Amino acid sequence: MGRSLKKGPFVDEHLMKKVEAQANDEKKKVIKTWSRRSTIFPSFIGYTIAVYDGRKHVPVYIQEDMVGHKLGEFAPTRTYKGHAADDKKTRRK
């Protein structure tokens, strides 16, 4: 179930302040955040936001087609190493 339209999209205030502060600077630095729940706004386009995945910050370059999605969608939290190999030689009969 999505968020109500009357509420509007959610973004953490501290993240919005960091993006607005960098809008004045010429050089765009990587913005670190723990806020995976924040919605990507059109003003974020062109910035690199490092989203925390539980172990490290994953750099995510914001593009136009990402607007409206959540930051956490682009920083997976689980690493899939694949299923165990089916080694028939070592199996007992």
Curated annotation (Swiss-Prot):
Name of protein: Small ribosomal subunit protein uS19
Record-stated family: Belongs to the universal ribosomal protein uS19 family.
Keywords from the UniProt entry: Ribonucleoprotein, Ribosomal protein, RNA-binding, rRNA-binding
Cross-referenced SUPFAM superfamilies: Ribosomal protein S19
Molecular function, one GO term: structural constituent of ribosome
Function: Protein S19 forms a complex with S13 that binds strongly to the 16S ribosomal RNA.
Presence of keyword Disulfide bond: no
Organism: Streptococcus sanguinis (strain SK36)
Transmembrane regions: none
Domain of life: Bacteria
